[in-house]
């Protein structure tokens, strides 16, 4: 049985996109064991991704910060496995060194530093036709196996206890269809315009559905609190009400997610939840790598498109109609 190490200590969306690599490794080596090194805040993303057997939490802003923290992490995990191969996302140099120290027989990564590349089993990577980030992650499996990778959907398995919380507590007594609204991003200029959000909420309500605002963090709280008090009463406020697995269960309860945030959008797609992406700053050409692949149920409204509430709602209705017809 082969044992693999996948290292990605990046953020929410980056982590979930790595599942394309994990699923390809499991497709090629069904009996293998896959260990995923994850950034601490996103451990519950990697833990329930399809193909992941075990998660090691890297607390890069806490006990594993800096070189001393890196060495502590190494000592915590040395000699646990003999890794047949390690796959280091974004060519992270600490991840490459860790893989070497842990004794990985082969290491695959996209890193162009002349010295670091001496540690890798691959040369400069020619991705050929693969443009999307998730496919480029998965291509590392092809380099190791010598067999073609498949472009496939990312998947996340929501644990039963998360569904129990959503169904028995958070959404208890709610029977109307829910439309998720995720307006807040890491940059204010990318956030869904408040006027657009409120216009959408009204359209959702008029259609007999419930507009639910989701998200986490102080910025999401501030966004909601800064809405006019009378208007925000239309929204079901679910900000900071869930853990990551519970958010997964909540998204599964939504007919559609309307999202300005890429990470949450990718998460919804991993759950097979239809998504309307609203990206103000990037056009479709710029999103060729990071935007959703065609096999996901989604609509993309990018720079140069129609960002009116009417158009966003039309795209939402189209997705709902397509889902009903399936």
Segment roles from a protein language model:
Residues 1-326:
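Catalytic machinery of carbohydrate-active enzymes
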């Amino acid at each position: 049985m082969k044992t693999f190490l996948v290292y990605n200590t990046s953020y929410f969306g980056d982590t979930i996109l790595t599942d394309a690599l994990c699923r390809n490794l499991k497709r090629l080596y069904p009996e293998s064991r896959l260990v995923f090194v994850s950034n601490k805040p996103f451990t519950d993303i990697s833990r329930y991704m399809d193909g992941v057997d075990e998660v090691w939490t890297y607390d890069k802003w806490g006990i594993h910060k800096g070189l001393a923290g890196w060495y502590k992490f190494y000592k915590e995990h040395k000699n646990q496995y003999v890794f047949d191969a390690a796959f280091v996302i974004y060519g992270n140099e600490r991840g490459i060194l860790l893989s070497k120290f842990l004794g990985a027989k082969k290491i695959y990564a996209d890193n162009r530093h002349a010295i670091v590349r001496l540690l890798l089993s691959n040369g400069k990577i020619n991705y050929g036709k693969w443009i999307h980030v998730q496919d480029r992650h998965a291509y590392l499996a092809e380099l190791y196996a010598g067999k073609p990778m498949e472009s496939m959907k990312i998947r996340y398995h929501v644990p039963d206890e998360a569904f129990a919380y959503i169904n028995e507590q958070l959404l208890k007594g709610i029977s109307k269809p829910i439309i998720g609204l995720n307006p807040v991003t890491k940059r204010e200029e990318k956030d869904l315009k408040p006027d657009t959000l409120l216009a959408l909420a009204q359209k959702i309500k008029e259609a007999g559905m419930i507009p639910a605002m989701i998200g986490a963090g102080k910025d999401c709280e501030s966004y909601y609190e800064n809405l006019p008090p009378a208007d925000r009463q239309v929204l079901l406020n679910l900000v900071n009400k869930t853990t990551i697995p519970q958010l997964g269960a909540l998204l599964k309860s939504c007919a559609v997610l309307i999202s300005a945030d890429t990470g949450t959008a990718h998460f919804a797609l991993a759950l097979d939840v239809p998504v309307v992406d609203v990206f103000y700053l990037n056009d479709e050409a710029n999103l060729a790598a990071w935007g959703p692949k065609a096999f996901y149920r989604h609509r993309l409204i990018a720079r140069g498109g129609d960002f009116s509430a009417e158009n966003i709602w039309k795209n939402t209705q189209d997705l709902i109609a397509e889902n009903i017809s399936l």
